[in-house]
Amino acid sequence: MNTAMTALLAGACALALALPASAQSAFPDKPVRIVVPFAAGGVTDAMLRLLQEPVGRSLGQPVIIDNRPGAAGMIAARLAADAAPDGYTVLVVNTGLIAITPFVQKSAGIDPQRRFAPVAVLSSAPSVLLVHPSVPVADLRQFLDYAKANPGKLEYAVVGKGAYGDVATSLFQKQAGVRMLPVPYQGNAQTTAALLSGEVKVQLTILSGPMNDYLKNGRIKALGVATAGPSALVPGVPPIADVLPGFDAVVYTGLVAPARTPPAVLDKLGHAFTTALSDPALRKQLKAMGMEAAPLDGKAYGARIVREIGAFAPAIKELETE
């Protein structure tokens, strides 16, 4: 083989090897789709629509929001998991969808640690222990005493058995040494109505929509927030951890991509979202919606997912035996 031919073949090989890296560096060259497992108009959907324009500007391509509700998020999860691992399809998830639902709905066949790669954390929202005013308690310690004196008599609202609120409340009961009865409802509007009417007396949930107004006018009472320290989202409400050390029920919302998405693509996506979340005006809008901006990169998010799966595993196992 002559020298010219050898050089030509060597150049062709080098070009072939360089193509994947070149394609990654050019990412994105078409719109990026965010699959949302919730209906349009909800809090998560509203947050993404706030991020849509600044993230698209950062990436240099439009960001498309694709709402795919149903099956407790598993329809959207499967769609995203089966997408090409090229960064053009990402899935928005929360703590329940990434650390609870796949292990409760095993028939869905979605192993989040195997099927997804973390992109970034977007926001956090703490769970708050709410009670109807008819419950004769003024604080969390009194509530625990009352619940222990009335085992199985207090009913709490959940959006479906095995959902985040159900599992988080199970962990709360286990740590507190109390026993309450779950009452499942179809959605957040129904659980809120049940708590306001006194149909149920308790709910551990994140605050959204008009819930803060109900707190202010006394239609419901907040006994504790499930964070390590006080939360700016619910000022004046003491941490549950003051009474139950270590109790944490904060809902994190983040983005994941199909497994095997190139790290450089994950980093570029994550940077675009975390940069957008640094805008003070946007952070203020999120706070008004009951969320705090919590921009964390993919590595930190991956570590959090592992911790969350481990934390909820005991409660999920108990649900399986009921």
Residue spans of the language-model regions?
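Bacterial N-terminal signal peptides
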Residues: 7-18
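A ligand-binding cleft/hinge motif common to bilobed small-molecule-binding domains
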Residues: 96-106, 171-175, 202-235
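Positively charged n-region of N-terminal signal peptides that target proteins for export
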Residues: 1-6
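Hydrophobic alpha-helical segments typical of transmembrane helices
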Residues: 43, 47, 51, 76, ...
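N-terminal (or domain-start) structured segment
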Residues: 23-114, 153, 161, 174-206, ...
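Hinge/capping helix and adjacent helix->loop/strand transition within the periplasmic-binding protein
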Residues: 79-88, 95, 103-186, 190, ...
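An extracytoplasmic/periplasmic, membrane-proximal ligand-sensing/linker region
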Residues: 29-31, 174-175, 216, 263-322
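Short hydrophobic alpha-helices and adjacent helix-cap/hinge residues
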Residues: 9, 30, 53, 58, ...
